């Protein structure tokens, strides 16, 4: 089957429709991929970049065996279709067993291991997790130190399943690693060990031992899968950083994997190899470099527990590509930018056909330079947790339009619409008109677990379908390509001007010293917001704020979009998948703007703190040293669109 080339191919596939026997579950879908050739390599893993030439490997029959064993283990622990298995894990082979075995037995909840303990506890409680799978104590890892103190805070938790990282160490070093793990446990918990560190009502299990006791031939539970069965909870952050738990069904994930398979065609199937470096708590890693290749009989190479963040992975990436004959990988723009600093010369990377880019818009200069230097074709796409994973992508077999997020995937509708001020549908956008991007189809999730987070989520377009309001702004051209023009919540609104951050970011990326750039709005009493930019320079490069300001002035056509300030920072705040975390930059500017406004009003020594609030978004508190300053503080703070409170610090009275 050829890869998609044009919108006509999308329509042709839709006219044919999905197969009548489309799997009802992800377990069945992987099983069909395994049946193509049970002896073919399915999954390879290396613990360190230095060991990538001698990975651990699973054939498809072994992969299905271990997924089935894991599902049966969870069933024996009391998991059914209505109960939740949560995991807080790095990228390991067992992580895949937990994901797909967990979905076969019940509902899987993916939690970011980089979160702090209290945030993890909140998600576990919200999900009503019955079983938690995480790492056992091991030197150099901090997951257990986050998990152990919060176990007593999760009343629904009945079983703790621990994965010993020492078992992934190869050769003679494994015995030494086991000793190190035991010493770490003793250092943390003394003679009482793990049992003394875990509440008595929570049973403790060793993952490998418990799994090995189960049969891998068939599922023990006589479960009849339905496409509407809930398969997973994935946690997704809003612009304020507040977590939302997205409810996804087997049918959502199966539909998306099937659609993406139609897009790539023979580009992902038997004999093809996919590299996974994004974290397995994120939908991109789980579907684009997990379920999709597994469902089509391709080989997945899982590189280190930290993925792209692993020591030496980026530095040796082209070597890894050559050794494993990688055909496809998925990454975020910051990773492509980092790879530009790694010489390609001397490595044979002719196997590498495509690199998928999502999570954030790809800077034009990075896109051009990467393709010119490596010859690798970048498929820029668009997706979101709420749409399972992929919603649109540039066609592998057709024109890849620089800056576009491509054609919609088969089976999922996608359009730009005009909404009124109340968020109600007015009409569809005409060709190349910017509007709110909406999607509808079998891949679209069921909603958020917390009901009040579903407000304004769905749109009624008077056509009998349910449409998801993505919150992004986009246009559709005459050939069906979509173009993101910004995110409504990220737009910088200066007076009457709506400024797309890309208007500032793209010119900054053209400067030879700039590695990555981000533009945000700084609160301003008079203009509402003023544009400011943050820049991280390339290693060894130099540039001043004045130099960058002069450079971009001739490249930004809209005077209102000229940034009032350019900050050069050592390291840009990033999310766990490498996406620039703009909320952190927004917080910095907000805090600085408010303190400056208070100082200008003669209110000195005030301390401003901020917190996420489920009702107000960002809630501020001003601690004063003088009670006489309260009235003036209310006047100053009232000029900004934030909820706030004040107090007088007793020690400063």
PLM region spans:
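Conserved AMP-binding/adenylate-forming core of the ANL superfamily
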Residues: 22, 39, 43-92, 96-99, ...
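Conserved adenylate-forming
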Residues: 74-79, 213-228, 233-278
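Short beta-strand->loop structural element characteristic of the AMP-binding/adenylate-forming
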Residues: 86-88, 95, 99, 103-138, ...
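Conserved AMP-binding/adenylation subdomain of ANL enzymes
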Residues: 103, 254-276, 283-327, 342
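Structural core segment of the AMP-binding/adenylate-forming
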Residues: 107-207, 644-652
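AMP-binding/adenylate-forming catalytic core of the ANL superfamily
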Residues: 115-125, 130-137, 322, 329, ...
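Adenylate-forming
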Residues: 134-148, 165-169, 305-307, 322-369, ...
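Conserved AMP-binding/adenylate-forming
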Residues: 303, 354-358, 362-381, 385-482, ...
């Amino acid at each position: 089957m050829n890869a998609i080339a044009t919108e006509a191919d999308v329509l042709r596939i839709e006219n044919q429709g999905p197969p009548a026997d489309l799997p009802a579950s992800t377990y069945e879908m992987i099983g069909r991929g395994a049946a193509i050739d049970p002896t073919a390599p399915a999954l390879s893993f290396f613990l360190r970049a230095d060991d990538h030439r001698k990975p651990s490997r699973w054939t498809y029959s072994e992969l299905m065996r271990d997924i089935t064993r894991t599902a049966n283990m969870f069933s024996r622990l009391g998991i059914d279709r209505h109960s939740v298995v949560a995991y807080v894990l790095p990228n390991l082979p067992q992580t895949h067993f937990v994901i797909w075995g967990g979905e076969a037995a019940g509902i899987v909840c993916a939690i970011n291991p980089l979160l702090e303990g209290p945030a993890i506890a909140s998600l576990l409680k919200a999900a009503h997790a019955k079983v938690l799978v995480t790492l056992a104590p091991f030197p150099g890892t901090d997951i257990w130190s986050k998990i152990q103190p919060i176990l007593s805070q999760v009343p629904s938790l009945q079983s703790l399943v621990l994965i010993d990282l020492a078992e992934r160490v190869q050769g003679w070093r494994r015995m030494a690693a086991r000793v190190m793990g035991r010493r770490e446990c003793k250092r943390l918990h003394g003679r009482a060990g793990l049992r003394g560190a875990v509440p008595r009502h929570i049973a403790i299990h060793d993952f490998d031992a418990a799994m090995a006791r189960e049969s891998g031939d068939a599922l023990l539970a006589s479960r009849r899968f339905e496409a509407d069965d809930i398969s997973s909870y994935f946690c997704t952050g809003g612009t304020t950083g507040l977590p939302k738990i997205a409810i996804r069904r087997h049918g959502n994930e199966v539909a998306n994997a099937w659609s993406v398979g139609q897009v790539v065609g023979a580009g992902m199937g038997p004999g093809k190899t996919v590299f996974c470096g994004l974290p397995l708590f994120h939908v991109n890693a789980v579907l684009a470099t997990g379920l999709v290749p597994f469902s089509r009989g391709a080989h997945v190479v899982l590189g280190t527990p930290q993925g792209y963040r692993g020591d030496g992975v980026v530095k040796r990436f082209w070597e890894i590509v050559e050794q494993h004959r990688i055909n496809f990988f998925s990454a975020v723009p910051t990773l492509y930018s980092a790879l530009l600093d790694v010489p390609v010369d001397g490595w044979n990377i002719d196997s590498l056909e495509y690199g998928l880019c999502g999570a954030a818009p790809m800077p034009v200069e990075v896109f051009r330079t990467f393709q010119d230097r490596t010859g690798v074709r970048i498929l820029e796409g668009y997706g979101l947790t709420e749409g399972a994973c992929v919603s649109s992508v540039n066609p592998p077999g057709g024109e890849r339009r620089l800056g576009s997020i491509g054609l919609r995937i088969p089976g999922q509708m996608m359009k730009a619409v005009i909404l009124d001020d109340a968020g109600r549908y007015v009409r569809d956008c005409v060709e190349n008109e910017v509007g709110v991007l909406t999607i509808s189809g079998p891949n679209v999730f069921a909603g958020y677990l917390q009901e009040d987070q579903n407000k304004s989520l769905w749109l009624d377009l008077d056509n009998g379908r349910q449409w998801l309001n993505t919150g992004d702004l986009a246009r559709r051209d005459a050939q069906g390509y979509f173009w993101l023009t910004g995110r409504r919540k990220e737009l910088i609104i200066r007076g009457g001007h709506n400024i797309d951050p890309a208007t500032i970011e793209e010119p900054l990326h053209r400067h030879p010293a700039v590695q990555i750039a981000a533009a945000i709005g700084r609160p301003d009493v008079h203009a509402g917001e003023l544009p400011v930019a943050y820049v991280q320079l390339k290693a060894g490069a130099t540039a001043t704020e004045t130099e960058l300001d002069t450079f971009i002035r001739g490249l930004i056509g809209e005077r209102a979009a000229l940034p009032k300030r350019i900050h050069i920072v050592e390291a840009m705040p990033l999310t766990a998948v490498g996406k620039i975390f703009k909320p952190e930059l927004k917080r910095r500017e907000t805090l600085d703007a408010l303190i400056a406004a208070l100082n200008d009003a003669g209110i000195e020594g005030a301390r401003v703190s901020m917190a996420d609030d489920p009702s107000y978004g960002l809630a501020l508190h001003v601690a004063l040293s003088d009670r006489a300053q309260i009235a003036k503080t209310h006047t100053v703070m009232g000029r900004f669109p934030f909820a706030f409170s004040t107090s007088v610090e007793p020690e400063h009275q």
